[in-house]
């Protein structure tokens, strides 16, 4: 695995950080994302994006990167909303994704983060990874999981997390275990040629991306760009599409392993494909 260096200390020299948002600040985030959702929803309805996935995939190519999570979440939940859904978010230091989920109707949102967080809102809970892991071991489950630009940092120590070379793979397994059997995860990672940038982040390509996705069925990748997904460019100018994932069950894994052994599959990272796992074989 190629290695580059760009060292960042987000621990305040080991003292740790505490990000606090009072009710007024969170209400501001909520109103901002509610307005963005309303604007995007009106556009999506006018353009018929809900009923035409191909058109949605083409349209999101022209949407600024920072809005991709909003567009994809709305696309999947505009009809059913997140009403009565429990959401877990892995890695955040400000409640933008939480506000987005509340805007989509989430019942409650749990945020898992190494830094100290205080979100003063009745529907928001913050928790450290070890405590969250214990809740999962005790059988607690969530309907929806989000990890936006988070797991690529896990195990590199930038945010005070333990140094674990496979911290990102472990995080994916924890997210899978935390989901209900038919739960859905939304994931973004920097894509390109495989690279570990110590201690900034990882970039995922043909070597490590299949390992990250090996326990998942890929329902879609938005927006998908085959060329950008394997570029070996500036590691600070990242391409991070939104992967929409569902945990694989044992029967499905057994059938797909049989297909692989029989040579009945091909490798393809295209949107909606789950062949990323097959490349790992």
Regions found by a protein language model. Give the residues of each.
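N-terminal accessory regions of S-adenosyl-L-methionine
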Residues: 1-86, 103, 198-207, 211-212, ...
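Conserved S-adenosyl-L-methionine
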Residues: 217-228
């Amino acid at each position: 695995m190629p290695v580059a260096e760009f060292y960042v200390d987000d621990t305040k020299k080991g003292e740790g950080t505490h990000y606090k948002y009072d009710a007024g600040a969170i209400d501001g985030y909520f109103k901002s994302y509610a307005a963005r959702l309303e604007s995007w929803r009106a556009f999506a309805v006018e353009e018929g994006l809900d009923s035409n996935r191909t058109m949605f995939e083409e349209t999101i190519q022209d949407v600024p990167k920072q809005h991709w999570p909003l567009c994809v979440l709305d696309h999947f939940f505009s009809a059913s909303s997140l009403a009565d859904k429990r959401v877990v978010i892995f890695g955040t230091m400000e409640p933008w994704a939480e506000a987005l989920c509340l805007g989509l109707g989430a019942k409650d949102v749990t945020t898992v983060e190494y830094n100290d967080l205080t979100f003063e809102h009745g529907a928001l809970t913050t928790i450290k990874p070890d405590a969250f892991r214990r809740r999962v071991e005790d059988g607690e489950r969530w309907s929806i999981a989000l990890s936006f630009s988070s797991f690529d940092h896990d195990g590199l120590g930038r945010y005070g997390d333990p140094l674990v070379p496979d911290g990102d793979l472990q995080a994916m397994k924890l997210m899978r275990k935390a989901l209900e059997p038919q739960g859905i995860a939304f994931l973004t990672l920097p894509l390109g040629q495989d690279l570990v940038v110590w201690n900034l982040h990882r970039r995922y390509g043909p070597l490590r991306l299949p390992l990250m996705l090996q326990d998942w069925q890929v329902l879609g990748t938005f927006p998908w760009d085959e060329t950008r997904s394997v570029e070996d460019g500036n590691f600070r100018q990242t391409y991070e599409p939104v992967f929409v994932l569902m945990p694989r069950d044992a029967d499905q894994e057994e059938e797909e392993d049989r297909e692989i052994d029989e040579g009945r599959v091909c490798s393809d990272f295209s949107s909606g494909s789950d062949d990323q796992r097959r490349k790992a074989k």
